[in-house]
UniProtKB/Swiss-Prot annotation:
The modification N-acetylvaline is found at V2. Keywords: Acetylation, Cytoplasm, Mitochondrion, Phosphoprotein. It comes from the Eukaryota. The keyword Cell membrane does not apply. Belongs to the 14-3-3 family. Residues 2-247 are annotated as: Interaction with SPATA18/MIEAP. One of its GO terms (molecular function) is insulin-like growth factor receptor binding. The modification Phosphotyrosine is found at Y133. It is found in: Cytoplasm, Cytosol; Mitochondrion matrix. This is 14-3-3 protein gamma. It comes from Bos taurus (Bovine). Homodimer. Part of a complex that contains DSG3, PKP1, YAP1 and YWHAG; the complex is required for localization of DSG3 and YAP1 to the cell membrane in keratinocytes. Interacts with SAMSN1. Interacts with RAF1, SSH1 and CRTC2/TORC2. Interacts with ABL1 (phosphorylated form); the interaction retains it in the cytoplasm. Interacts with GAB2. Interacts with MDM4 (phosphorylated); negatively regulates MDM4 activity toward TP53. Interacts with PKA-phosphorylated AANAT and SIRT2. Interacts with the 'Thr-369' phosphorylated form of DAPK2. Interacts with PI4KB, TBC1D22A and TBC1D22B. CDD domains: 14-3-3_gamma (cd10024). PROSITE patterns: 1433_1 (PS00796), 1433_2 (PS00797). The lineage of its organism: Eukaryota, Metazoa, Chordata, Craniata, Vertebrata.
Amino acid sequence: MVDREQLVQKARLAEQAERYDDMAAAMKNVTELNEPLSNEERNLLSVAYKNVVGARRSSWRVISSIEQKTSADGNEKKIEMVRAYREKIEKELEAVCQDVLSLLDNYLIKNCSETQIESKVFYLKMKGDYYRYLAEVATGEKRATVVESSEKAYSEAHEISKEHMQPTHPIRLGLALNYSVFYYEIQNAPEQACHLAKTAFDDAIAELDTLNEDSYKDSTLIMQLLRDNLTLWTSDQQDDDGGEGNN
């Protein structure tokens, strides 16, 4: 029998060494013990996989950009090599996402009781995130399917968070941040993205006095990110309008 505390300790150690694949493997084993995760364990799992998938997302973006430039050059051999490499990274990224999604469906979301609102929203947000990462690299019907799954998870989490959590709660704010990014980047719906982000920001500002001391830093940081995105997106929309002569 694997010792749970040893696995968690290993994950902490791997995080300090920035060995995120090891960290993810340890937290995957903890999750598969099929017992609820503590807040710390939940965060360890999230940080581990965020770094594992983040490295692949970053590599994929770099190679995709090189692929576009190479296509313009017309060097067939090089084009084929770059495409094959992009597909290799894509497969790795998809495998990581499927790993997380199966942990969420088979253990984490499934085992949330009615009273574990915070955990349920956290895991549904995570589900939306990992389907969003799949949507970044998918095309055609496959993309449509993962986009729909992402929207469904975000939407469910959003409804629960609005009903049961303070507008200043960092998990509710983090969900609004990522859900609005989904609308902007994946759905190409800037108006919906801005509306969601602005509502979350305004609601939190209106209830600043409910800010929990423990989560003050997290909440205010996410509020800042929401505001930064709003500034960027509204200026982008104005630029687009300007280009179309709609000033």
